[in-house]
Amino acid sequence: MNVGYTALDDVHFFSSGFDEKELTGRFTTEYGGRHLDVFPINHRLRYLMPFAEPQKTIDYLKTFKGEDSVLVMADDGEKFGLWSGTHELVYTRGWLEKLFGLLEKNSSWLSTARFSDCLAAPSKGLAYLPTTSYHELSQWSLPHEKSRKLAALWEGSAEDIRPLLRGGYFRN
């Protein structure tokens, strides 16, 4: 089976030394001469959607306005209606309808696309990515006391240092 592309949490890229503003498109990784395109999943979009007002998502996306950027939001579908309280938030209170309205309103500079639509643009470069997972899972996979220590270190660290803090391996 040939897989041409995938999406991974941006923490993989941060652990390799990339900055958030660099992660605006797909990258290529390789092993033994076999190539795979990788789209970084933007953690800020994951945390904004659907828990912040839709305008905050648009405001964040505006920080990339004018650039030829691809930002990926991919996450568990259950947070859009199955998790406790999310059905009311997303549908009853209209979060999703508001977001779609704002996407239409901002369509002069903002568009949505499928991964396959973004493959025509060149790769942003080569990226060798470590085995890791998103921060919370790397924290949860540690023994309790070490998990608490990592949480305290995370909370006390500057935002630009946080991507360099790694917890345990997610298969523990």
Q: Each predicted region: which residue ranges?
A:
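Acidic, His- and aromatic-enriched active-site or binding-groove loops in soluble protein domains
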Residues: 2-34
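Short helix/loop capping segments that flank catalytic or ligand/cofactor-binding pockets
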Residues: 15-16, 47-49, 81-83
